[in-house]
């Protein structure tokens, strides 16, 4: 079940009038395969929804490609890293390439699908800076200009910033 809500009237102090609509959108997260799920967010979260996966993609964007580099950067257990790299390769966000035959060694590089995920990743970073920004934090800067990234999501059709207009989920026929 998915809960959708929308404000139906002006806010009066800390109170907002809410209509709550509960609808079935095929978002059963207990489904054995993500392809059964109608929601593209739910499908994506089946393999992108954990911190290790997102941090591996962050590090791949920063130029890390080898197992030991990811392990050192993240402090992740080898078995966990092996599983996450296998999933990211299977889901085609990373491509495994052999860089040495003796001994056989492989590296992992971002695919187009992995590069397409980067705006989402840096939006999460911007949200974290804004809402969890206490203490010292890394800054993400444009490599050419050195200016801080300030990512926003814009709807390509309307030009409106995502989050400034209502969004509905529409079930396919």
Question: Which positions does each model-derived feature cover?
Answer:
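N-terminal helix-turn-helix DNA-binding core of bacterial DNA-binding proteins
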Residues: 39-80
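Short, Lys/Arg-enriched N-terminal segment that forms or immediately precedes the first helix
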Residues: 22-45
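Membrane-interacting alpha-helical segments
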Residues: 3, 13, 17-28, 71, ...
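Basic, amphipathic "hinge/linker" alpha-helix immediately C-terminal to the N-terminal HTH DNA-binding motif
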Residues: 49, 100-121
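C-terminal regulatory/oligomerization modules of transcriptional regulators
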Residues: 2-24, 122, 126-173
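Extended, folded domain segments that form the structural surfaces/walls around functional sites
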Residues: 57, 65-70, 85, 117-121, ...
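Canonical helix-turn-helix DNA-binding module
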Residues: 67, 71-99, 103
